[in-house]
């Protein structure tokens, strides 16, 4: 894909000021957001790190007439309280007030879905945005755990099963389906 990094923004006023539709990627720190973005575009665009909390800005990527935004992770990032509060506020403002935003890709760890993930889903549902939940790192589950895990994730997050999909950025399993479903978020917005 001919995608490229566009810019980083520290708040909404720094975001691109136009009408190009956007999909954002969000999830807990170290869940694999940046790795999923790189796998999605089939090139290293987003910086990855073993250290949780590296992404602390809104990072914009552009592909044709669409934009994708890598949001800072929430959760256990090793950052001070002021920075955590800033990121929480930034995420809330972005989801509620970014008019270009047409969909959310929430990445969760297929082995450990948290109450924080559940709270984020509530916010997404309140916004009325289209969304997809990607259960990443599913390569760590055995075959029998996979179906039940996805069903449990959907039940725990209180969403329809068809809004969830497994993926593995490590093995690239199911990435074609993830790719298709992400682009469907743009199409759903046009209806």
From Swiss-Prot:
It comes from the Bacteria. CDD domains: YihA_EngB. GO terms for molecular function: GTP binding; metal ion binding. Keywords: Cell cycle, Cell division, GTP-binding, Magnesium, Metal-binding, Nucleotide-binding, Septation. It holds the Pfam family MMR_HSR1. SUPFAM superfamilies: P-loop containing nucleoside triphosphate hydrolases. PROSITE patterns: G_ENGB. GO terms for cellular component: cytosol. GTP binds at residues 27-34, 53-57, 70-73, 136-139, 167-169. Its cofactor is Mg(2+). Residues 19-188 form the EngB-type G domain. GO terms for biological process: division septum assembly. Mg(2+) binds at residues 34, 55. Necessary for normal cell division and for the maintenance of normal septation. Belongs to the TRAFAC class TrmE-Era-EngA-EngB-Septin-like GTPase superfamily. EngB GTPase family. NCBIfam families: GTPase_YsxC (TIGR03598), small_GTP (TIGR00231). This is Probable GTP-binding protein EngB. The gene is engB.
């Amino acid at each position: 894909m001919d995608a490229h990094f566009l810019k980083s923004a520290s708040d909404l006023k720094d975001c691109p000021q136009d009408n190009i539709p956007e999909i954002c990627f969000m999830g807990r720190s170290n869940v694999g957001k940046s790795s999923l973005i790189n796998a999605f575009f089939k090139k290293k665009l987003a910086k990855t790190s073993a250290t949780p909390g590296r992404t602390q800005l809104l990072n914009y990527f552009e592909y044709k007439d669409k934009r994708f935004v890598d949001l800072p992770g929430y959760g256990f990032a090793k950052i001070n309280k002021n920075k955590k509060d800033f990121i929480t506020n930034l995420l809330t403002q972005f989801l509620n007030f970014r008019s270009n935003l047409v969909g959310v890709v929430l990445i969760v760890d297929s082995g450990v879905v948290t109450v924080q993930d559940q709270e984020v889903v509530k916010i997404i549902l309140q916004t009325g945005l289209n969304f997809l939940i990607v259960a990443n790192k599913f390569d760590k589950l055995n075959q029998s755990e996979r179906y039940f895990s996805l069903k449990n994730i959907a039940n725990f997050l209180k969403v329809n099963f068809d809004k969830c999909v497994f993926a593995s950025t490590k093995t690239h399993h199911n990435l074609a389906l993830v790719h298709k479903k992400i682009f469907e978020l743009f199409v759903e917005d046009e209806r």
